[in-house]
Every structure is written in C-alpha cells, then in structure tokens.
C-alpha cells in the first residue's frame, strides 16, 4: 500500500520562490502546506529586501526631483525628510504587499504554518512553533525556498548599535550625517544612492576595481561618474583590517593603512543561504560554503524528492527569477518533468538613483566573442518626454549584429530604466527573424514617451552601417 503523508508537498519559505511553488502546486490539485518562520508571509523580499529598499529609493528620488525642479523649488530652502519618515512609507508598502500575499494563500486554501522547520528523516519535518511546542509533519515531497541573509564575518560586531547589515538598516533610529558602506555590490550601491539622496555623506568601500563589474562597462562608468558628481566617495580595491564600534560611530581600518570614521556602518558584502537550521544532514544533503544547494534543471537537489529554489541555490538571486523557479519546480514535482524553463537572458534591474537595467550581452562579452556588432544610442536629454518631466540624465544603448540586425544586448541608465528595458526584451525574445533592430524603425511610438528612445537608438545604430 502507498504511504500516507500529511501533505503531498511542504514548501519551506513564503518568499517569491516559495509563493511560486505553492501557487503552482495548489493549482495542480496538490495538498500543500507552507512553513514560514515569521508572523507574516512574503519572506525577505517583502520585509527586508526588494520591497522596502525600493520604497525608500522612490521616496528619496521624489525628494531629489522636487528639489531640482525649478517650478517648485525655492532655492533658498530645500525639502527634507527624515529617515524615519521615509521608513514609514516603506512600512505602508510592506503592509499592503503582506495583506495581498496572505490573500493568495487563503483564496487557494493553502495552509500556512508558522515556525522553524528541520528535517527528521527523508519525509518528516519537525516544526518548532512560536509557543515552544514541536509538531511533526510528513510529506511526499519538499521545496526548500528559505532564502538568504546578510553574511556576517565573525570579527564584525553586528550587535553594536551603529553597525548594520542590509536587514537591520531598516530599523535605524538615528539620523546619520556620514555613512560608511562596505561592499559596492547591488545592495551597497542602492543604499549609497538612498543616503546620498538624503544629503548624507557616503564613503563606499569597494573590494574590487570597479563598480558592478558584471554590467556593460559604460553603464558601470556612468554610475561611477554619477556617484562622483553627487559627492559619494568611492574607494576601490580596499578591504577592512579591523572595524571598531564607538559610542559616537564606527572606525574602519583598511588593509591599505587608511582609517575612516563615520556615524554608522552598513556592511553589505555577501549573503548566505538560510540552510543551517534545516538539519539537512538528516536527509543526506550538503551545502556549499555559502549555505547554498546544488540543483538540476528541474530544481531537484541530490535527493530527488527535495527541490530548492530562490536565493538558496545562488545565481541569479533575483525575486523575479525565484518566482519562476518555484513555478517550474512545482510543475516538475507533480508531473515528473517541467516543460517550462527560465528564459536565457534574464533582465537585471538595479535601483540606484538613476536606475540601471540590462538584458543580453555586454560590449565586453561581444568583443571577447569576436561578434561583429554595432551600437545604437539615445540620450535621454534629447527626448521630448525626458525634457518635459526633467529626467535628462540617462541613455539607452542597443547592441546588434551588423549583418543580421539581431539585437544582442540592451543597456539603460536613467530614471525608469527597469521599465524601459522590457520593450527591448520583448523583441529580443521573438523567434524566426522577429528579433531585429529594424522593428524599432518600422513601428510607431506614442509621442512624447521615453519608449521613443528605442527609435532614436535604432536609427543611430543603423546609420553607422556601411
């Protein structure tokens, strides 16, 4: 007789990956429970990561826009807002997102269980509940979607009230005048924009030789220049020797011999998977040094009945991709295989001020591959819509094959870049000759719009051909 389990599948984590898996499973008729360690669903994305940081960024960018607009600004007086004020805006967005996502589970009759899960054996979980009790749950299959957390080196005193990571920064209760940010990845650069936009002095410590080296170099250089122009001090190729927490701030000793002091430190250098409490050794699974699990194309781990999605499997570590991974894993879990798969060119959105977004190859990659490409550019300052709304800083760059006209990569720097990129992405995904830069010349755009940048860039690129 077949074994009887409490559930067909248990999903550990309610972030984008867990939500995608849970919704995919219940839509296929599976009996599903979702385990969430916190009181509210949504995971790190909703409560400490994507949603609050982007809400902060939006509030700050609107303040900057107001202060720079000659129609509204009185140059003898600037509009200012406290960190607490803009955190309130983020809290409102978080609450809306939480209620909406809670509704998804309720409407689909998906059970939510609060507590910390750990494996007892291959088909059994122990759930440590908030009241101290322990429940035993069984399932035929599992999806691990427990996300990640900021990496904490053992020699950094994170309990110190002036030393923050990208989670605890959202609980800041003082108004800093000077911030040190260690780590110039996506999170570090986004918070550098936020704090500098609030007129806070920022020292950005980069352990590498340029910002966001995975980007097209022109985009990286544009961000570096914009930071320099706004007053952010960037220190490349630096590593800390020692970090001292003081009563009035933080002192950072760098291996190069420099010493820096500021009101507080945001440590934003790396993340680690939330797998250490799952007792994975009880089911024969091991993680790498970052707490991440290896999976196959269907998101199965080394144990075929255990799947993993989202940050816990590493690249690309994007909320958008995690949801799709969960949906694909759900299909594979129920049907034995998945017909869906992640798209080849996943767009990247970086919410600095201004935004950066890209999809496809960079100039550096195409040059190394010896692909005969050409470049088409549109400067935002030449677009009527950008002039109307005062968003003159920015550019759209299209890389395309000189002979076939196929679009190979699109890169955008400027306000609304993460939205603008999807127009080009839609054309890049077309098959059978549909992916061509000539589409943008032969179609009619609304006028005036930021989308018109595609027509301008396409004409600019095609005019370079001979």
Swiss-Prot record:
Single GO molecular function: flavin adenine dinucleotide binding
InterPro entries: Class-I_Pyr_Nuc-Dis_Oxidored, FAD/NAD-bd_sf, FAD/NAD-binding_dom, FAD/NAD-linked_Rdtase_dimer_sf, Pyr_nuc-diS_OxRdtase, Pyr_nucl-diS_OxRdtase_dimer, STH_gammaproteobact
Gene3D superfamilies the UniProt entry points to: 3.30.390.30, FAD/NAD(P)-binding domain
Top-level enzyme category: oxidoreductase
Any one of the GO CC terms: cytosol
Catalytic activity of the protein: NAD(+) + NADPH = NADH + NADP(+)
Stated role: Conversion of NADPH, generated by peripheral catabolic pathways, to NADH, which can enter the respiratory chain for energy generation.
Protein name, entry field: Soluble pyridine nucleotide transhydrogenase
Gene: sthA
């Amino acid at each position: 007789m077949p074994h009887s389990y409490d559930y067909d599948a248990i999903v550990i984590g309610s972030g984008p990956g867990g939500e995608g898996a849970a919704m995919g499973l219940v839509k296929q008729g599976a009996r599903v429970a979702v385990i969430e360690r916190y009181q509210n669903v949504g995971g790190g994305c909703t409560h400490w990561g994507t949603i609050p940081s982007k809400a902060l960024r939006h509030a700050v960018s609107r303040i900057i826009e107001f202060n720079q607009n000659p129609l509204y600004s009185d140059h003898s007086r600037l509009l200012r807002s406290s960190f607490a004020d803009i955190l309130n805006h983020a809290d409102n967005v978080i609450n809306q997102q939480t209620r909406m996502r809670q509704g998804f589970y309720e409407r689909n009759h998906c059970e939510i269980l609060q507590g910390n899960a750990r494996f007892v054996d291959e088909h059994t979980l122990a759930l440590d509940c908030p009241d101290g009790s322990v429940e035993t749950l069984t399932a035929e299959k599992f999806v691990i979607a427990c996300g990640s957390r900021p990496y904490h080196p053992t020699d950094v005193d994170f309990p110190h009230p002036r030393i923050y990571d990208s989670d605890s920064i959202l609980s800041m209760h003082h108004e800093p005048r000077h911030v040190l940010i260690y780590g110039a990845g996506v999170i570090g650069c986004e918070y550098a924009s936020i704090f500098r936009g609030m007129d806070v002095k920022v020292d950005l410590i980069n352990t590498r030789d340029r910002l966001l080296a995975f980007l097209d170099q022109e985009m990286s250089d544009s961000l570096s220049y914009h930071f320099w122009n706004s007053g952010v001090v960037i220190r490349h190729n630096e590593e800390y020797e020692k970090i001292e927490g003081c009563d009035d701030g933080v002192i950072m000793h760098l291996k190069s011999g420099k010493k820096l002091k500021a009101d507080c430190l945001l440590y934003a250098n790396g993340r680690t998977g939330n797998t250490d409490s799952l007792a994975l050794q009880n089911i024969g699974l091991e993680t790498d040094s970052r707490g991440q699990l290896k999976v196959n194309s269907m998101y199965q781990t080394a144990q075929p009945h255990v799947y993993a999605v989202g940050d816990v499997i590493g690249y690309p570590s994007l909320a958008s991709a995690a949801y799709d991974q969960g949906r694909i894993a759900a299909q594979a879990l129920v049907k034995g295989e998945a017909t869906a798969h992640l798209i080849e060119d996943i767009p990247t959105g970086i919410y600095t001020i201004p935004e950066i977004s890209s999809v496809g190859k960079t100039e550096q990659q195409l040059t190394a591959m010896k692909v005969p490409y050409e470049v088409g550019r549109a400067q935002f300052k030449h677009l009527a819509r950008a002039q109307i709304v005062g968003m003159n800083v920015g550019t759209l760059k299209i890389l395309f094959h000189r002979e076939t006209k196929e679009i190979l990569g699109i890169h955008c720097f400027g306000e609304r870049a993460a939205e603008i990129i999807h127009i080009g992405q839609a054309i890049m995904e077309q098959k059978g000759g549909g992916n061509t830069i000539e589409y943008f010349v032969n179609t009619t755009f609304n006028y005036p719009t930021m989308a018109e940048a595609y027509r301008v860039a396409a004409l600019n690129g095609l005019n370079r051909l001979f």
